[in-house]
Design a protein with these regions (language model features):
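Active-site core of metal-dependent hydrolases
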Residues: 160, 168, 175-282, 290-291
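His/Asp/Glu-enriched, well-ordered alpha-helical/loop segment
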Residues: 264-349
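Divalent metal-coordination and catalytic microenvironments
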Residues: 7, 20, 25, 48, ...
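Active-site gating loops and adjacent loop-to-helix segments of metal-dependent hydrolytic enzymes
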Residues: 66, 70-73, 78-93, 142-157, ...
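Histidine-rich, glycine-flanked metal-binding segment
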Residues: 1-2, 9-52, 373
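C-terminal cap of metal-dependent C-N hydrolases
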Residues: 7-9, 24-27, 339-382
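Divalent metal-dependent hydrolysis catalytic cores, especially in the metallo-beta-lactamase
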Residues: 78-103, 109-131, 146-162, 181-195, ...
């Protein structure tokens, strides 16, 4: 049991200075003043700090991405403390380019491991590839019968994409949609968007030709070039959900793109931010040769949030929505996740006056305290 005293609560909307009592992995009470006399209750002084929902990063290569530069460029698996020190208490894992030396089986095993270590984890079946790599040989069965799997990954308009036809894209989306309905899950298609000239055109075409709801198809990396970004804004205006990626280009940071989106009357609730953490970033020349590559960090999510507040003048409560409540609603786990409310999961961050992460609580357990790692993942300290 944990009692956080005298803390400024952002749910993400500002609630004022409160006391927050946590027990059994849940937020039990949020009141002006809570006093319990019990040695079993851990007291945390929240004076001068902000209490926010834990960040939800819906695009992380938890088993490592990369591989486009041969075997030596396969990125490593992520560790628990890399996520918690970045304020991430819920993560969605997925594969990337490589569905050949990587597998959905390994992805689900890693998801299970991170869950055992204390955070909340979901996953998507598939990779860039088509036919889709799965665990059960069926998109529908993966989503229906594997607890962690809530959707499917596919790539579009990219030189690494499988160049699916509109009919094939329809079938993937239909399978995800129906499986989600049958299992009570989002049943979404996370669509990696590349630099290809077609952009979102295939998506627009299949939505016009079918009854597939817009919410089923979630394009990500849409801030990688101007034309794609404008297409994505139109998509979000029409009711679709779009995901902006941290660290793509200086002039296309998520915060700057959201500023533009709001000026163009794009509904803010249809925009989310993710890190693409532990995926590789790569640069290619005009002939398609790999020139440079590296690995993205999950800490970019927290850094982007800070920049939005400190450099771009977003209010704390507004900047938080793009990494908490908007994401939770899109994943259909709100209000269990993504907010600070009585009855919600106790996934909480304490931020200091500089918005740096002081304390992280995941499912009611203290993972980081006073900027010190309390809980490490298996083998992290070897």
């Amino acid at each position: 049991m944990i009692l956080i005293k005298n803390v400024e609560v952002y749910s993400p909307e500002y609630k004022g200075k409160k006391d927050v009592f946590v027990s059994g992995g849940k937020i039990v009470l949020i009141e002006e003043n809570i006093n319990f006399e019990n040695e079993k209750i851990k007291i945390i002084d929240g004076s001068g700090k902000k209490l926010t929902p834990g960040f939800i990063d819906q695009h992380v290569h938890i088993t490592g991405g990369g591989g486009e530069g041969s075997f030596k460029t396969r990125a490593p698996e992520i560790t628990l403390s890399k996520l918690t020190t970045a304020g991430i208490t819920t993560v969605v894992g997925l594969l990337g380019t490589d569905g050949t030396t990587r597998s959905v089986e390994n992805l689900v095993a890693k998801a299970e491991a991170l869950k055992e270590e204390g955070i909340t984890v979901f996953a998507h079946t598939g990779s860039y590839e088509y036919p889709t790599v799965t665990l059960t040989d069926s998109i529908k069965k993966d989503i229906c019968f594997i607890d962690e799997i809530i959707g499917v990954k596919l790539a579009l308009s990219d030189h690494r994409a499988p160049n699916v036809s509109n009919l094939e894209l329809q079938r993937v989306a239909s399978d995800a949609r129906v499986a989600g309905m049958l299992s009570g899950k989002p049943g979404i298609v996370v669509l990696h968007m590349g630099d290809g000239k077609k952009g979102l055109q295939p998506v627009r075409e299949i939505l016009e030709e079918t009854e597939i709801p817009m919410k089923t198809i979630r394009p990500t990396h849409v801030n990688r070039r101007e034309e794609l970004l404008e297409e994505a804004f139109d998509y979000a205006k029409a009711g679709g959900k779009i995901d902006l990626t941290c660290g793509i280009k200086e002039h296309f940071t998520p915060g700057k793109c959201i500023k533009r989106a709001l000026e163009e009357n794009v509904p803010s609730e249809n925009i989310t931010i993710s890190s693409d953490g532990y995926g590789s970033w790569s640069k290619y020349d005009e002939a398609g040769n790999l020139v440079k590559m590296g690995v993205s960090s999950v800490s970019s999510l927290h850094n982007e949030f800070k920049d939005m507040v400190k450099e771009l003048d977003f209010r704390v409560e507004d900047a938080l929505t793009y990494v908490t409540s908007n994401v939770a609603k899109g994943l259909e786990v709100y209000p269990r996740k993504g907010c600070v409310e009585e009855g919600s999961d106790a996934d909480l961050l304490l931020l200091d006056e500089n918005l740096d992460i002081d304390t992280v609580i995941a499912n009611g357990k203290v993972m980081i305290e006073n900027k010190e790692i309390i809980v490490y993942g298996s083998y992290e300290q070897i």
